Amino acid sequence: VFPPDVNAVFDHGKRDVSSFPIATGTYYKQDYSAGVDISKYKNIPVPTSYMAIQSKFDFVGGYEEDVKGGLLHVADHHVSPGKKQWTWGNGDFGRAWDRNLTDEDGPYIELMTGMYTDNQPDFTWLQPYEEKSWKQYFMPYAEVGYVKNATKDALLNMEVKEGKGKVILYTTGVNKDVHVFVKDNVNGGTLFDLSLIHISEPTRLGMIS
């Protein structure tokens, strides 16, 4: 789950690049010219790394559709620009590693983040007596789908289908007097406006026409 402003990904050292989520060229020597959604594990036949191009969002994660749950990382993107996912791939080689690494759980995605770097081979200097510190949060979540924005306190998803939008809000604690509204920045006006007494679990907030 990369943020919605990620439209390209790189491999190690930025030697190769692909559009994202729909790949339209060659990436890791695989022909995706037909237009392939490489955000889906099932569509990646070989071991593949992809690191997100610069994003203004503070999160990255993964979501497993069959169990409707996932893992999310949240950190200030000015300090933690690195957002990476890696997989053995959904091919014979990848499935062989699945058998070696787990008894029953099957394939997995490695989620990696980078402080002060947006690509794995990069490094940063630490001067004598210099100290660098940061805060980051790893959290599980469920029943939300593909997150569109997140903080350490709340996760938000909005899906549009057949002209209607669905808003799903997930919080990491009990929140009182919650006010949720969606604005139309193109045509103006408010599409959705709802006040909640409290929220403490995944909540579907209704449809927006």
State where each predicted segment sits.
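Single conserved hydrophobic/aromatic residue that forms the stacking wall/gate
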Residues: 197-208
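A contiguous, surface-exposed recognition patch within enzymatic or periplasmic domains that forms
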Residues: 2-131, 139
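A general sequence property marking short-to-moderate contiguous segments
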Residues: 132-147
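Beta-strand-rich binding/interaction modules
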Residues: 165-193
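Acidic, contiguous internal or C-terminal segments within carbohydrate-active enzymes
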Residues: 1, 136, 158
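Active-site proximal loops enriched in glycine and acidic residues that flank catalytic Cys/His/Asp
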Residues: 113-115, 136-138, 169-171, 184
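Surface beta-strand/loop "capping" patches
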Residues: 144-175
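Short amphipathic beta-strand/extended segments with alternating polar/hydrophobic composition
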Residues: 75, 193-195
